[in-house]
A protein has these predicted regions:
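Long, low-complexity segments enriched in small/aliphatic residues
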Residues: 556, 565-571, 722-817
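Short beta-alpha connecting loops at secondary-structure transitions
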Residues: 6, 69-75, 183, 434-442, ...
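N-terminal cofactor/phosphate-binding cores enriched in small/glycine residues
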Residues: 12-69
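N-terminal export/assembly segments and adjacent metallocofactor-ligating motifs
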Residues: 2-13, 17, 25, 53-55, ...
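Hydrophobic alpha/beta core scaffold segments
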Residues: 347, 602, 607, 611-619, ...
Length: 901
């Protein structure tokens, strides 16, 4: 339905329930505002949008007045302009006259409208606010409340976008101010330092502190790109000073398809690593005679020399000891195009499938489990659909607000605004638990028993979707027989979750359809990870929640391009597009496409298996691109010994990482801001990254380096651009068949499968039919973790990340704002356990397993249960992976990071 009205003599049609402001904007009529943003609730606070409405008494605020049929509006009446001028004059009586030095100069809405309405600073000056500038110690948000115009945008943004409610109004009348918490510092009030308030502030009252003094808005160019931290796929603009060539700040954009104006602290403030003085700037070759300089033990080399040595060594070991003696670590930090080239070199040049990347360490069990059950190992629904259309979220093993913050905050927003229900299954009491109707705090490693117990209750009450099961699935009877072995009482005995909570979870899932299931590494990083994933697929098929809006099985992937790296074949068992290396048809297809013979049909070694092979001497040479196994792999003492035993190691990275220190050759790559390419996010959305600045020194984009190495190995690679590589990917990868740069650059937002150039993409998988035909119910039994507590090792250790750091910390430890917010490693320990051991808050403690130990400060918290400790791998000295074990899921070969004794 629509309404018809007249604005400035022009006939306008607008959707029903539009405001005058929305109707005017849709018709191209600009009405001034200072407190309006389309993302937020309108409050009519600034009075700048007042308009004349025929028949109405007085001026009306366009942002809050509904557009109605037959309304006649004049936006530029004398009365309206005079009122706006008066508002601006009053604001200037209590506003600093410091535009010449203000950080917001050129990007200030007040300045814009003062200029537009030709308003001068008044000769008279009334009482003015006088608050200390920058007194709040936040390392990321510069607060100057002398410039605040009380628009309330920061208050509403924090509440409505972040659902965090840090900013609020205090006092009344002229003394009204905006404060954090109960007039506290931002950190005291619990601020997450996301900077959303800064993004919405129309003046200079809130500003990005790290950007202070880096250049005015007029001196910046904006380059649209995609974040290189997690796989949510947030897009933003890198602001580059046109004079210095340096990135000055990150600004959100409402056009971003996934995140809009929302960003997390890492995305907004964690990119100063780009210009770190620790960046690698030139190729390096090991030379123990070098004892001084930036990198003792290495000498600088030319690109020709370094590439020649790499190529010569890789060819030597291939020809001397066979293709299986060479391995390649590709990277989820790199682009689709670069991962494609890396696996192509491994297969077409070295003739081995020994190529893998960090998906093996985080979501390999997701790929294996979903491929078995559904035929496709990826998130089924789009982020917007799963968060906005679901009636219930079942979040298992995902600390969403810390690890995928934009999705986590979106969940909290829907819970508050729409009443979406939330069930959390997690051994820790994470932030989401505060908004949940039910927290299932299972013992680590008992997920299958928990989910089977829930499904027992669903079946016992006849709550399953029989029509869906009969029409779309198979193997139900075998599955049912297994599930009926897990009544809630038995599941409770195994998991530690009370039986009544298991029953309540089943009831909530049955009564609130569609429900969306989300999980992350709390589900996947187990020796039973693949079974965990298949059991969640069972649950959603049982309820008929797959292939429908608001439902689905939705793994939240880790690294920025872990989905894409899998898609383009950086896995040991599949070519691009998940075409199996053991299938003769696929082998022949890629031999023809790549112009080679003799591609291997033997499944290659995974990351952990390659490390093991290096340890035994079977793997001679290893090429590592933007991976850091000396921080991210389990059992780091074993990894260190393996790297030391390699005959040749080449590391291609942007920093001298812990792994690079073992290398024979180091090749300096370009980071995401220094090259073009594409990333694919967790919802299968392919998005562009774009070059904003030059790499430091003679560092080069990874795709260019790989082309040179392949050519030097005797297999010429010459692509004019990443777009040309993407065209080749499209030619051999059916799910990417219609992915083209010209489509992405035209603004198309494509989710695979995209089968041809006219295909619009696929927001929801398995609609009507599953990729494999019928969904496969699997029978999954409870299996205990490989390690359980003993008298000698009485604690269970689980692992993860914190909000302010990312994985091994190579980037975040080189970000000043992030290090200021989280400067050292912490271990979560229950207060009662700490009391028994005589440990106080903040004590440095040593955590020891059968394999090794690490040191971190104790954080005493009931977020963890008795007998459970939680640590991270962001800091070398406090890295839990000195203590974790390399016990592998037999199907996906993923290590069991989540349970160590």
């Amino acid at each position: 339905m629509s309404v018809n009205l007249t604005i400035n003599g022009m006939q306008v049609s607008a959707p029903e329930e539009s405001t005058i402001l929305e109707a005017a904007e849709a018709a191209g009529v600009i009405i001034p505002t200072l407190c309006h943003h389309p993302d937020l609730t309108d409050v009519g606070a600034c009075r700048m949008c007042v308009v004349s409405v025929e028949g109405a008494r007085g001026l009306q605020t366009a942002c809050t007045t509904p557009a109605v049929e037959g309304m006649v509006v004049e936006t530029e009446s004398t009365e309206a302009r005079e009122a706006r001028t008066f508002v601006l004059e009053m604001l200037l009586t209590d506003h600093p006259n410091d535009c010449m030095t203000c950080e917001a100069d050129g990007d200030c809405e007040l300045q814009r409208w003062v200029y537009e309405y030709d308003v001068a600073f008044p000769d008279h000056q009334g009482i003015r606010h006088d608050t200390p500038i920058g007194a709040d110690p936040s390392p990321v948000i510069l607060v100057d409340m002398n410039k605040c115009i009380l628009c309330g945008l920061c208050v509403r943004a924090c509440s409505e976008v972040q659902v965090h409610d840090i900013w609020n109004f205090s006092q009344r009348g002229f003394t009204t101010i905006v404060v954090a918490g109960a007039n506290q510092t931002l950190q005291e009030a619990g601020c997450l330092s996301c900077g959303t308030c800064v993004a919405y502030c129309p003046v200079g009252a809130l500003f990005d502190r790290p950007s202070q003094g880096w250049g005015r808005a007029i001196h910046q160019k904006k380059v649209r790109t995609t974040c290189n931290y997690c796989d949510v796929g947030c897009q933003f603009d890198l602001n580059v000073n046109i004079h210095t060539g340096k990135i000055t700040r990150v600004t959100a954009t409402p056009e971003a398809p996934v995140n809009g104006m929302a960003l997390c602290v890492k995305g907004r403030y964690g990119n100063d690593f780009i210009h770190s003085e620790e960046r690698l700037t030139t190729p390096l070759i090991r030379d123990e005679s070098v004892v001084e300089g930036r990198f003792p033990g290495f000498r600088e080399a030319t690109w020709d020399e370094a590439v020649a040595l790499v190529a010569e060594s890789l060819v030597h070991w291939r020809d001397t000891c066979g293709p299986e003696s060479v391995g390649y670590f590709s990277s989820a930090k790199c682009t689709n195009e670069e991962n494609y080239l890396m696996q192509k070199i491994s297969r077409a040049v070295s003739k081995t499938n020994n190529v893998d990347h960090c998906a093996r360490l985080c979501h390999a069990s997701t790929v294996a489990g979903l491929a078995t059950a559904l035929g496709s190992g990826a998130m089924t629904n789009s982020i917007a659909d799963a968060t906005e259309e679901a009636k219930l979220y079942f979040v298992a093993g995902s600390n969403t607000t810390e690890q995928h913050p934009v999705i986590g905050r979106k969940m909290l927003k829907m819970i508050r605004e729409k009443g979406t229900k939330l069930i959390v299954a997690d051994p820790r009491r994470i932030e989401l638990c505060d908004a949940a109707v039910l927290h299932l705090q299972q013992r680590p490693g008992t997920d299958v028993a928990l989910f089977n117990g829930i499904m027992y209750e669903i079946l016992a009450n006849g709550w399953e979707d029989r029509a869906y099961i009969d029409a779309r699935t198979e193997n139900f009877d075998v599955f049912r027989e297994m599930v009926m072995m897990f009544p809630p009482e038995r599941a409770a005995e195994i998991t530690g979750v009370p039986a009544d909570k298991i029953r309540e979870a089943a009831r909530l899932l049955a009564e609130n359809k569609p429900a969306a299931v989300f999980w992350a590494m709390g589900i996947t990083q187990h020796t039973t990870g693949t079974m965990n994933v298949m059991t969640l697929a069972n649950l959603q098929m049982l309820l008929g929640n797959i292939g429908v809006p608001g439902g689905g099985v939705n793994p939240l992937r880790g690294q920025n391009n872990v989905q894409g790296a899998c898609d383009v074949g950086a896995l040991s068992n599949v070519y691009p597009g998940y075409q199996r290396v053991t299938d003769p048809t696929h082998k022949a297809k890629f031999e023809e496409a790549w112009g080679v013979e003799g591609l291997s049909d033997k499944v290659g070694l995974t990351i952990v298996e390659m490390i093991n092979a290096a340890h035994t001497g079977d793997l001679k040479a290893l090429y590592v691109m933007a991976e850091n196994p000396m921080t991210s792999d389990p059992d780091l003492n074993h990894v260190r010994e393996a790297l030391e035993r390699l005959d040749f190691l080449v590391v291609q990275d942007i920093f001298m990482t812990e792994t690079a220190k073992f290398a024979d050759v180091i090749l300096p790559g370009a980071c995401f801001a220094e090259k073009d390419g594409t990333f694919t996010n967790t919802e299968r959305r392919i998005q562009r990254i774009r070059k904003a600045v030059d790499p430091p020194g003679v560092a080069r984009p990874d795709w260019e380096i790989l082309c040179d190495v392949a050519t030097a190995m005797g297999y010429p690679m010459a692509y004019p651009s990443p777009a040309a590589i993407q065209d080749e990917i499209a030619a051999v990868t059916p799910i990417y068949g219609g992915v083209r740069y010209w489509r992405l650059d035209a603004g198309e937002s494509l989710q695979w499968p995209v089968t041809d150039d006219a295909h619009p993409g696929t927001p929801i998988l398995h609609v009507g039919t599953f990729t494999r035909g019928k969904g496969l119910f699997t029978a999954n039994d409870h299996v205990e973790p490989q390690e359980c507590p003993t008298v000698e090792y009485p604690f269970t250790m689980t692992t993860g990340r914190v909000l302010y750091h990312w994985h091994g910390g190579a980037q975040t430890r080189r970000s000043q704002p992030l290090m200021a917010l989280s400067p050292e490693p912490l271990v979560e320990l229950h207060p009662d356990d700490a009391s028994r051991l005589g440990i106080a808050e903040g004590d440095k403690i040593r955590v020891t397993s059968r394999r090794g130990d690490f040191i971190a400060r104790a954080w005493l918290t009931d977020r963890v249960a008795l007998g459970l400790i939680f640590g991270t791998f962001h800091f070398p000295e406090g890295n839990v992976n000195w203590a974790t074990g390399a016990f592998l899921d037999p199907q996906a070969k993923i290590p069991e990071y989540k349970v160590s004794a």
